[in-house]
Curated annotation (Swiss-Prot):
One of its GO terms (biological process) is tyrosyl-tRNA aminoacylation. The keyword Protease does not apply. The gene is tyrS. A motif ('HIGH' region) lies at residues 48-57. This is Tyrosine--tRNA ligase. It comes from Synechococcus elongatus (strain ATCC 33912 / PCC 7942 / FACHB-805) (Anacystis nidulans R2). Residues 338-402 form the S4 RNA-binding domain. It catalyses: tRNA(Tyr) + L-tyrosine + ATP = L-tyrosyl-tRNA(Tyr) + AMP + diphosphate + H(+). A motif ('KMSKS' region) lies at residues 235-239.
């Protein structure tokens, strides 16, 4: 067990319930940790509704790893059962239900992407569970017991439900079951702490209530912030194009991270690295480069990160790509959302739409050094493209500006 607890608060938005000055382990997570009589069970549930994980997701897994390093057991719950419903939190419409095959395929991809973050090797540090183990076998009597622990009013107060109800948008009964099933996960694995984003407080609180209902000691909730994406305004999301995927190649990852807006750099260092926040470089450009190098090293190794840094530098400083020689194109002249082939044809490179499509399909178009391979990829908003460079072939470059 570590005797330094600074890791607990770093990047943490809220712990509940929490009276940090108290010595009572029932109301103070720090007191529970300092008690040290046994490893705590730290629950994190993930619903594999997609195949990719991005840096916004990584925040919570980094915190889980910190608990592992402090000697506790990470209980990673793969929501193979709940993913078929989908978490309705914050959603303005019903989620598409996935097949069991979809979920299993996504889960395997998730676990592969998590290997650079979590400790999969040390005995007792990681427990991987699938919530179909206990949810698939629930009989009607048990389901009615779960439903009896909450009121319709409590459910409608949940983010997303009330908005849809007020607008007359359907809210289906199976969606009401989602927070109860997530809460029952906490009963099944007897978690001491549950990690989640700030949008998960309701669901985690339901878990506390259900643990109390079934005679267990209620878990603590530890909430982590939602990472703002590369556009500097909206949460990181693949659909918005403002993300950095964990499975991206080193150069693509580096090129994106060295352009993180200045206003976000401090948050990115706090949430995505272990760098001493008091010892960061004073020069903003140097901070961006250090951030990119650190994060890429975590997922690709130091050697690959250094190579990516060199390649990125050559991209903007080589004889054909002097930064000052790259023309700029205002994104205000592009209609969004925009498909990739339309974007490439619209930014002053002298290509028709059909030519742009062929160039993309032939692998001749890059965005910040990463190949664009789908001419129909949709860029939702211009903010995610600010400052990025489109390259066609070896000699055509344009920098996108707002």
């Amino acid at each position: 067990m570590t005797d330094s607890w600074t890791w607990l608060q770093r990047g943490t938005h809220e712990i509940f319930p929490d009276q940090p000055e108290s010595a009572d382990p029932d109301v103070s997570l720090l007191a529970r940790l300092q008690q040290g009589d046994r490893p705590l069970r730290i629950k994190l549930g993930i619903d594999p509704t997609g195949s990719d994980i991005h840096l916004g997701h990584s925040i919570i897994f980094r915190k889980l790893r910190q608990f592992q390093d402090a000697g506790h057991t990470a209980v990673l719950i793969i929501g193979d059962f709940t993913a078929r419903i989908g978490d309705p939190t914050g959603k303005s419409e019903v989620r598409r239900q996935l097949t069991a095959e979809d979920v299993q395929r996504n889960a395997e991809t998730y676990l592969d992407q998590l290997r650079p973050i979590l400790d999969f090797e040390t005995p007792g540090r990681l427990e991987i569970r699938y919530n179909s183990e206990w949810l698939a076998g629930l009989d009607l009597a048990k389901i009615l017991e779960l439903l009896g622990t909450m009121t319709v009013g409590q459910m409608l107060a949940k983010e997303g439900f009330s908005e849809r109800y007020d607008k007359g948008t359907p809210v289906y009964l199976h969606e009401f079951l989602y927070p109860l099933m997530q809460g029952y996960d906490s009963v099944a694995v007897q978690s001491d702490v549950e990690l989640g984003g700030t949008d998960q407080k309701f669901n985690i609180a339901v878990g506390r209530d259900l643990q109390r209902h079934f005679g267990l000691q209620p878990q603590f909730g530890l909430l982590l912030p939602i990472l703002i994406g590369l556009d500097g305004s909206q949460k990181m999301s693949k659909s918005l194009g403002n993300y950095v995927g964990l499975n991206e190649d080193a150069l693509s990852m580096y090129s994106k991270l060295e352009k993180v807006p200045d206003a976000l750099v401090a948050d990115y260092f706090e949430l995505l690295t272990s760098q001493d926040l008091a010892a960061l470089p004073e020069n903003p450009r140097d901070r961006q480069k250090l951030l990119a190098l650190d994060v890429v090293s975590q997922y690709h190794g130091a050697e690959a990160a250094a190579a990516a840094q060199k390649a990125a530098q050559e991209l903007v400083q080589g004889s054909a790509v002097q930064a000052e020689a790259v023309p700029e194109f205002p994104l205000s002249q592009v209609n969004f959302p925009a498909k990739a082939f339309y974007l490439v044809s619209a930014v002053g490179l002298g290509l028709t739409s059909s030519e742009a499509r062929r160039q993309i399909q032939g692998g001749a178009v890059r965005l910040d050094g990463q190949k664009l391979d789908d001419p129909n990829h949709i860029f939702e908003a211009p903010t995610a493209l600010k400052g990025r460079v489109i390259q066609v072939g070896k000699k055509k470059f344009v920098r996108l500006v707002l």
